[in-house]
């Protein structure tokens, strides 16, 4: 039986130790191609670079760098013919991120966005993140085992009929999983939902030596709301969280609100 082909990306850049550890662990059961950002792209979310040209370079055999965002990297790999991949991958894994992507972090995370870009294009995908206090090789091995499980349980969506033009093939969303590893070197594993990860949001105004104002934004302290079965609760009790993410963001529970809004607007 042929070995699976797995595309590995991240948002920390192709030199990141977490990516290298995870790619090495995945090579135990699959062939790996890496396509990752040239530089760190944390918190770039799902942005694509459309206002300037991108550059792609092969920095080592089957290791590619793109001077763009994580989503750019996966987009280029999946749509660039055989420049990066010899064929469509069986799975895309993004990570292993240096730091967590719990709860609402998924909306900002470049790590999660790289995986989401693949899922939008019909390729099963997994985002993997580890606490800075996690033992790297052990965390990578745990994430690789979950990736191996996913690639066997969620095979790629069937190829559409030959009559479908190639640019529009494999557009059916595929499974998307978010994995977070807490501190330590051995962990239980839990199937979870997204939790609530709340930051002390800060805007800090400063002045440069010439008296011109500049500012920094970002979260300060962080706390987790207690929510049974959540990824944040799993983290707090020392368990690896495995969370399935939806690509359909429709809030069915708010349909009454939107219907009332529509009713309140006179027809033109």
Named regions from a protein language model:
Residues 2, 6, 16-87:
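A cross-family phosphate/adenosyl-ligand binding-site feature
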Residues 9, 35-37, 67, 94-97, ...:
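Short beta-strand segments
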Residues 100-109:
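Glycine/threonine-rich flexible loop motifs
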Residues 114-118:
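Hydrophobic/aromatic ligand-binding patch that stacks against planar heteroaromatic rings
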Residues 119-142:
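Glycine-rich phosphate/pyrophosphate-binding loops
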Residues 140-268:
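Electrostatically charged, flexible surface regions
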């Amino acid at each position: 039986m042929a070995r699976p082909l797995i595309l590995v990306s991240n948002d920390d850049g192709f030199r990141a130790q977490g990516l290298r550890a995870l790619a090495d662990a995945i090579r135990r059961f699959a062939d790996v191609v890496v396509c990752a950002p040239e530089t760190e792209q944390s918190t770039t979310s799902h942005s694509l670079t459309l206002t300037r040209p991108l550059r792609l370079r092969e920095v080592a055999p089957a290791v590619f760098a793109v001077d763009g965002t994580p989503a750019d990297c996966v987009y280029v790999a999946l749509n660039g013919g055989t420049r990066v991949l010899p064929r469509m991958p069986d799975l895309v894994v993004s990570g292993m991120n240096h730091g967590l992507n719990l709860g609402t972090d998924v909306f900002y995370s470049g790590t999660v966005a790289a995986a989401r870009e693949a899922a939008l294009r019909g390729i099963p995908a997994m985002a993997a993140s580890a606490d800075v206090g996690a033992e790297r090789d052990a965390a990578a091995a745990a994430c690789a085992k979950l990736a191996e499980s996913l690639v066997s349980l969620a095979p790629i969506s069937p190829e559409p009929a030959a009559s479908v033009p190639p640019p529009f093939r494999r557009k059916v969303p595929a499974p998307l999983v978010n994995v977070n590893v807490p501190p330590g070197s051995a962990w239980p594993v839990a199937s979870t939902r997204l939790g609530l990860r709340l930051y002390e949001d800060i805007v800090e105004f400063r002045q440069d030596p010439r008296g011109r104002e500049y500012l920094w934004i970002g979260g300060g302290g962080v706390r987790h709301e207690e929510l049974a079965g959540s990824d944040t609760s799993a983290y707090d009790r020392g368990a690896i969280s495995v969370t399935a993410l939806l690509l359909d963001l429709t809030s069915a529970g708010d349909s009454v609100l939107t219907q009332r809004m529509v009713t309140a607007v006179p027809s033109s």
